[in-house]
Design a protein with these regions (language model features):
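Hydrophobic alpha-helical and helix-loop surface patches within well-folded domains
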Residues: 1-152, 199
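Hydrophobic alpha-helix feature that most strongly marks membrane-spanning transmembrane helices
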Residues: 81, 100, 114, 130-133, ...
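Beta-strand-rich binding/interaction modules
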Residues: 121-122, 136-202
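Edge beta-strands of extracellular beta-sandwich domains
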Residues: 177-178, 205-222
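Generic recognition of flexible, low-complexity loop/linker segments
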Residues: 63-64, 124-127, 137-140, 151-155, ...
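Flexible loop/turn segments at secondary-structure boundaries
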Residues: 14, 61, 98-103, 208, ...
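Short, glycine-/Ser/Thr-/acidic-enriched flexible segments
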Residues: 21, 156-158, 170-172, 204-206, ...
């Protein structure tokens, strides 16, 4: 049973063991995509909606689910990477045998795992359980006495975790794991007569962190939890698309506007409803214009929803059939809510559903 005084650990542990680990055993690529999905969900919630693991008790909305399930599952993933597979499994076995008829907390998990490792887990748990926020990774390379350079990695906080680092140059490639602790770490890097150096931090999404802008892939869930979204209706038979979208798809109300507001913050999302011609025109201006071939062709009778970025603005494009009633639109919008993890969705008149995700991009620090 869960001792809720220090947070609900069971949802995250169940997600990690019952859902994630089975995926990892079958395919590391799919496991990586699942870890990325947790981080992508985190990127879609606002700072004001974020709570600590200690404050999470049960799921109420998208933000609480992101923390209580996603962040908690990633916490156990980082714990496993910190102490190793065998100690992690033995820890869970001991924890089950000790507390199966009792209430237990994150602290009890910590104390049980501490008997299986020499790593100070108090510091690790304290950096993740009562805190909000996440590491924002950056790297810097400075020249010292040749052939050495100094590599500095900053994460904008004091979290503790093992960080995978990939360093490649003209001559060679190095993969290592560094223990992040404190504000930053600095270490010497020997690079022999190279013209350029490329660095990847956590390239496989093994830690709970803020994704770099280059790594962000648009998802429909971005708009389910969005706040202060601007609504723009171009052409459609729908009388009041803003009200329907707010009621059946989003957790918050949109701001209805007929034309874009140039003074509005580019961080605030935009929802555009129109016919196939107008939506295709906007899609061709987006960062996913090349990738959009996966959802083509779009006919005038299809319902299409696409999450993308246009001039750095999160944008949801919705194309409705040429003839549609408010009732049918409400049903389609409500159905789309179940596809939050995807980047785009297409529903044909006969009900056939196609869906997909934009390819994940890597963040590379080049020097």
């Amino acid at each position: 049973r869960v001792d809720y005084s220090s947070g609900n650990w069971s949802e995250g542990l169940t997600t990690y063991l019952a859902d994630y680990w089975q995926v990892e055993l079958a395919s590391e690529d799919e496991a990586k995509e699942m870890r990325y999905g947790w981080l992508r969900n985190y990127a879609s919630i606002t700072d004001g909606d974020e709570k600590s693991l200690q404050a999470f008790t049960t799921r109420h909305h998208t933000a609480s689910s992101t923390i209580g399930y996603g962040k908690s599952a990633m916490f156990f993933h980082m714990l496993r990477k910190s102490i190793g597979n065998e100690p992690f499994i033995n820890c869970l076995k001991d924890f089950w045998l000790t507390y199966r008829y009792q209430s237990a907390s994150f602290h009890d998990i910590r104390d049980t795992c501490q008997t299986h490792t020499n790593i100070n887990l108090t510091v690790f748990f304290d950096s993740w359980i009562p805190t909000v926020g996440a590491p924002k990774l950056s790297a810097n390379l400075t020249q010292t006495n040749a052939p050495e350079r100094l590599m500095t990695i900053n994460h904008d906080g004091k979290w503790v975790y093992p960080l995978d680092v990939e360093i490649s140059s003209d001559a060679n490639a190095i993969e290592s794991t560094k223990l992040m602790r404190g504000d930053e770490i600095t270490f010497a890097l020997s690079v022999d007569d190279v013209k350029s150096t490329k660095i990847k931090l956590d390239p496989n999404f093994n830690i709970w962190r803020k994704l770099d802008a280059a790594e962000l892939v648009g998802t429909l869930r971005d708009f389910i939890a969005a706040k202060q979204a601007t609504y723009i209706q171009l052409t459609s038979d729908i009388q009041d698309g803003s009200a329907i979208i707010s009621t059946y798809f989003m957790e918050n109300t949109t701001y209805g506007e007929q034309t874009p507001d140039s003074n509005k913050s580019k961080k605030d999302p935009v929802i555009i409803l129109g016919d196939i011609a107008s939506i295709t025109e906007h899609l061709n201006k987006s960062v996913n214009a090349i990738d959009s071939e996966h959802l083509m062709p779009i006919s005038e009778v299809d319902f299409v929803m696409v999450s993308t970025y246009i001039t750095n603005t999160p944008t949801l494009l919705i194309s409705t059939p040429k003839v549609i009633t408010d009732k049918d639109f409400s049903m389609l919008i409500s159905r789309a809510r179940h596809y939050g993890k995807y980047s785009w969705l297409k529903i044909s008149p006969n009900g056939i559903t196609e869906k997909g995700k934009w390819p994940i991009q890597e963040k590379v620090f080049s020097f």
